Amino acid sequence: AGASVKIIAPISGQINSAKGDAIKIDHSFPTVSSVMFDSVYIPGGTDSIKVLSTNSFAILFINETYKHGKPIAASDEGLLLLAKAARAGGAINDTYSEIGVAIAENNEVNDDFAQDFIDLIGMHRFNERPDLDAIAA
């Protein structure tokens, strides 16, 4: 068993990191569907989250991932995007259920957080989320 990591962004081609490093984009949100993936991790980054928070394709991607019961992990400013997607999707109390969602406590992306996400991926789906019918996706 193994995992394959893909970078998805609002545009195709490449983007630059905060340090100026080029990052190859594997897919763009307008041309890819969440059904192609088993899980999603939303990392932080103030500038990237500002851009993604105003991108309807990114919001839809997260909501579809959640609605399909797939694992989601978020850290740092990625928590803001996760919350915005939940509100936009019509989640109960404007927040997703914690079932199948890994959150980096105190923004600590450490081995425990990584293992929690790996364990969630191993469980595959979380169809027992109480709010799946409420999510617009």
How does the language model describe each region?
Residues 1-137:
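Active-site-adjacent pocket-lining segments in enzyme domains
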